[in-house]
């Protein structure tokens, strides 16, 4: 996507400043992701993540965003009550100017604050990195303790239902055997 098109899209979000730099993030395989640096009125630079959400995987962005907002609000409130720092605990979503993520050219775009000093790993053989990933997943689960899951939308039906996933794997293997 061209830089001027991305800037036009980015200007649909509630950010005080002007986009000055755009970099494509090549990690990930579902969504198209860009890092955008803004120059603020205070002449500082602040970085954000602009993401085109793949509608084949996530057809209903408003429901997905509602889930994200509910979960991050819950986790931040819980951490604040414990006196913990919330700066790096969750992502911070940026609202669109009209509070409708589907309104940007009838496509699914979202933006969040960039978390400095982070790194993405698509694969690793490092036991240390795997251990840290496990700790992060465990901490996420612990921070969700008590969250009313029934308030969430089911974004991908039966995605976390293990018997369904096993059946999908068996079907894929069977299909692969039949095509060989």
Q: Can you annotate each of these PLM segments?
A:
Residues 1-23, 75:
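Juxta-kinase regulatory segment immediately upstream of eukaryotic protein kinase catalytic domains
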Residues 21-178:
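Conserved ATP-binding subdomain of kinase catalytic cores across diverse folds
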